[in-house]
Amino acid sequence: MRFLPTLTLSLLLTLAPSLARTEEVKVLVQSSPLAGSQYYALSSVWGDIRPGDKLLLKREPENRHDANAVRVEWNGHQLGYVPRAENRALAAAMDRGDKVEARGARMKRHRNPWQRVEFEVYVIL
């Protein structure tokens, strides 16, 4: 009667993650400035976007300037990109299907567009 213990173990292993985890665990993996904001919609949504707002990350593997490009959007508005110097690991994680999330962290009016918005990227476990 090895079938029952094997079946029970299989069932527990299948159900354990959903039983043990009632909420998602988010791990901060990256904090970056927003690249290219001067070319996109940031100025038109500046008064509406707030620190803590959820940002959408979209991979652009066919981007002619950067095969690791990750676009950053807020409510359907493209704000810019994850900086090229910081996007390789994030692009690889997204390509693997890892769950990631981004949120605006800090915003300030500044002449230098690289200092206007900082955002954080989390991996969801």
Regions of interest found by a model, annotated:
Residues 2-11, 18-125:
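Conserved active-site motif detector
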